[in-house]
Amino acid sequence: MSTYISDRELEELGEGLTRHYLENAHVQMAARCIDIEGLANYLGMTVVFETFAEEDRDKVGFLADGRTPLKIRRKGSIVSFCFPLGTIVLDAFLRQDKESGRRRFTIAHEIAHSVSEKHNPVPQFHRIYDSEHGYTFQELKAQLTMTENQADRRAAVILMPQFTVDQALRDFN
């Protein structure tokens, strides 16, 4: 079940989470780039890379609930593998340097889901939108849910909290 959270609340929650991490991990508050994998580890999450073999090729990230299997390629075969609760699984292509922005956002997106569903973990996929793909109504409906929108919003705030944006503006003006 989705609960509506205003944009302002999402921003406060995301920024608060990032501040808490930076303060408790003894990271400089003026950091321009949030160590998103460090934040995931700080929250007790593990980030791993696998080659996805899901039918939906838009899936690039997965937040494991410890029960739901993910189809991956291992040694040339497709296997269904159950990752431990709190594991963020990223498609292996996201390791490429040119995918660093998408990799960072996907990790932040899955962190946002984890924080939102802390008391009732459910498996979550992060999908990319392919402008050349002809989506069905059901596919679009799955991508454009309130839960996904909120996770995207919170991910953006986790990566770029207002205090880092303000600092960057001061530094470059």
Residue ranges: model-predicted function:
Residues M1-N173:
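Active-site hotspot residues in diverse enzymes, especially metal/ion-binding acidic/histidine motifs
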